[in-house]
């Protein structure tokens, strides 16, 4: 009896203790840019779906003769880690000294990593889990800071006071890649501007209005374009300007241009330069006149009250409205003016598009998302965050002249917030103050290939062969990695990028705690086994979304058991027989070898193309329908006629089936391969089967005709509720020559006592 959980635990420990997947450089090297998961939560079904994909290829390429560098890492710095630590350890920066806060974050991250390692370990990933990187480590900090200094010296990173996106909840600047569009219910407020009515969802920014904007083709406003109107309550004048971007059907077709209500405001402000009125200060609205230090909600309520009291409010109506929100917390963002660090990207869009075209996208249509993102970029990448647990900027500022002072590379890693410096500004002053911001976590994740390769002192192997990631972070992780690769190396970061879809519950719903439909990977592994979970992960094409369907997990578990039973049958049938495949005579063996080689060729081509689901389906069809249902049944008698040949062929096929399943289902295949080859270190280190034309026999597939007859007799017995081993007498019409050549096989396999054969164009069977 096979205990799947016990078996899987045995081989996990075996791989780990014997360093089976330790990277050993060779002549052919294959490098995977592994996504480093954050430590801000548990492994979820999205991980359990996407991470096996990279392991399929890692195991396959090892068997194809490559030295596979499949590294592991944790993205354990930045805002997600801070949020996790504050929740788990009940500490905040407000009541904890910075050095102590950093220490607590680091300790909590390390504790979480130990638990998370087991989650990925349980999936059967063939990483070298003994040698992983952490983005918060001194090693990663040094490299991040060094590359940042290079960008500054090459005028690709700069500090500027400019409009920037800010999250009021997270209290930090963010970048365009951190935003998502969210539809919310809000009030559309209609306001009277000296006879022209405008509609706005941000009435609290009335004191920041610097212009009114209409569409130049709107007949209602053509005559008043370029005229001036008075801003209600504030009594200053603004000009009415026109722009094609204004939707004539939204509200009244006339809008306020404020500094700044949203990204559209910023675009118009940059285009027309109407002046600036900043009233958002420290996440509060403060115009010094009407609104003084109120939150957005409080300010909105107050300004509507004042408009109503002064007869400027026409009406309000409830609408659904799309707003920019922070992807991390869902808070609507604000745009303020502040000093931040940026990496230039707007001036190299063409180069980034060219690099995207040099990468093979799997599936190809996912490249369009990257191209649309790059083409639509409107901001340089803001990389500074007003947070605490992240990569420090290796920067000081001169208090006397405002100059920027960079750390020497020999000093790295350095945290200017916690350590003094003897450096002096170029003006001669030693009166320096540290940069207190930290780098965006994407600024470190975007150099993952560099971190992994420098971890083994092998930058000469750049670029990596492939990156596996979700489609939801094409505009963040894929984009920033390509950007950094261009800026530092003028090269692609990887030759291929494989994009996976989302995971949904059995009914196609997105999983969430509020819906109560969360499914834990550990629960599935405990019930069905990791091999079954990996089988489920191989059921969709690249880029496709997937449902958690029990039938896929059941099918995976059944495949584990079927492999186990068929392997034991082959071992039993071939026991104590010295096999040989030097001269294949048996019609059955010639047929099965021809079928196998054609299957092998198809599966190999599909695996080479990263079509894991189609490859596994091809293999499933051969294993279940051809090998198990027919060949294994036939050789129970055939082995008596051709013992040496059939013993050798059956073992050859079973061993190669095990090898071909091993990238997808590594646990059961490791167990079974050791039954056939006790001295093997691992099936994953064995050679993948190679297509052999010598085993393609002319006319061998004519035996499909006999298989069709056998299946029809099976169906008859089943309909008659007869045991497959029960004797039966039949009259069989068909191709008399083909049937006579295999009559003994038909009689033996289907227990036909009396077989009457006659010629016919079609197969006809009658029970006698």
From Swiss-Prot:
Keywords: Aminoacyl-tRNA synthetase, ATP-binding, Cytoplasm, Ligase, Nucleotide-binding, Protein biosynthesis. One of its GO terms (molecular function) is ATP binding. Its main location: cytoplasm. Transmembrane segments: none annotated. A motif ('KMSKS' region) lies at residues 510-514. ATP binds at residue 513. It catalyses: tRNA(Val) + L-valine + ATP = L-valyl-tRNA(Val) + AMP + diphosphate. Coiled coil: none annotated. A motif ('HIGH' region) lies at residues 37-47. GO terms for cellular component: cytosol. It is an enzyme of class 6 (ligase). It holds the Pfam family tRNA-synt_1. Its EC number is 6.1.1.9. It is found in: Cytoplasm. It comes from the Archaea. Gene3D superfamilies: HUPs, Isoleucyl-tRNA Synthetase, Domain 1. GO terms for biological process: valyl-tRNA aminoacylation. ValRS has two distinct active sites: one for aminoacylation and one for editing. The misactivated threonine is translocated from the active site to the editing site. Belongs to the class-I aminoacyl-tRNA synthetase family. ValS type 2 subfamily. Catalyzes the attachment of valine to tRNA(Val). As ValRS can inadvertently accommodate and process structurally similar amino acids such as threonine, to avoid such errors, it has a 'posttransfer' editing activity that hydrolyzes mischarged Thr-tRNA(Val) in a tRNA-dependent manner. This is Valine--tRNA ligase. It comes from Picrophilus torridus (strain ATCC 700027 / DSM 9790 / JCM 10055 / NBRC 100828 / KAW 2/3). The lineage of its organism: Archaea, Methanobacteriati, Thermoplasmatota, Thermoplasmata, Thermoplasmatales.
